[in-house]
């Protein structure tokens, strides 16, 4: 069996595709919508446990739905996330959660591999976003992905074992299906204190978005 045939189960992927319409990339700049999800619903237990960054009592909660093959998502994590972490997450102003919303089998595979690393999931996601062009858009993406994750300590045996884990794959798509129930139909999508924003946030607009959310939380 070649590496390219080790893609996550096509049957499960197609079932997920039938369950919810596969989205496209969101607008390049974040746009506030009229949709608001109550925090008790947004923070309800997911099919996979949330990986939370920041203090539990932070006044602003940001939940991002992302795909590993979304270029806007990669740009956000490269250009904006470092500032978000330094100025807002690490200072106790923001609690941040990234949830899986794979656009395709390549993204699902990348999320599965990141989840296989336990508490190193977010570091793996940051790495794979940084390396996105080198694995996601090649002629042999799964072979390229296998080579990329070697730098994360994932050898060939673990790579193959992880991509055969149908329980994990179903859970990742269940997270995405729940996101769609919240109104997610493109990536990246952000919920900031429950208010839905479509598209990538930029550094310039970040202070006002968070300031407005803080005011609304008081």
Q: Language model features by range: what are they?
A:
Residues 56-58, 106, 202:
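Short capping/connector residues at structural and topological boundaries
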């Amino acid at each position: 069996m070649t590496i390219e045939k080790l893609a996550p189960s096509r049957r499960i992927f197609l079932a997920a595709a039938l369950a919810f319409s596969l989205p496209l990339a969101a607008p390049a700049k974040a746009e506030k919508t009229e949709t608001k999800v109550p925090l008790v619903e947004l923070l309800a237990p997911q099919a996979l446990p949330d990986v939370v960054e920041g203090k539990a009592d932070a006044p602003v909660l940001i939940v991002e739905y992302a795909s590993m093959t979304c270029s806007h998502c990669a740009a956000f994590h490269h250009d904006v996330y470092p500032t978000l972490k330094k100025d807002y997450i690490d200072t106790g102003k923001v609690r941040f959660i990234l949830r899986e919303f794979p656009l395709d089998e390549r993204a699902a595979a990348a999320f599965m591999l990141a989840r296989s690393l336990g508490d190193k999931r977010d570091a793996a996601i940051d790495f794979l976003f940084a390396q996105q062009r080198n694995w996601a858009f090649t002629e042999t993406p799964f072979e390229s992905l296998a080579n990329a994750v070697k730098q994360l300590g994932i050898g060939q045996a673990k790579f193959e074992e992880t991509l055969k884990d149908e329980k994990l794959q179903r859970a990742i798509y269940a997270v995405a299906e729940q996101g769609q129930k919240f109104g997610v139909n493109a990536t990246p999508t952000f919920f900031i204190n429950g208010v839905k924003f479509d598209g990538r946030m930029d550094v310039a607009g970040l202070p006002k978005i968070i300031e407005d959310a803080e005011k609304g939380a008081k």
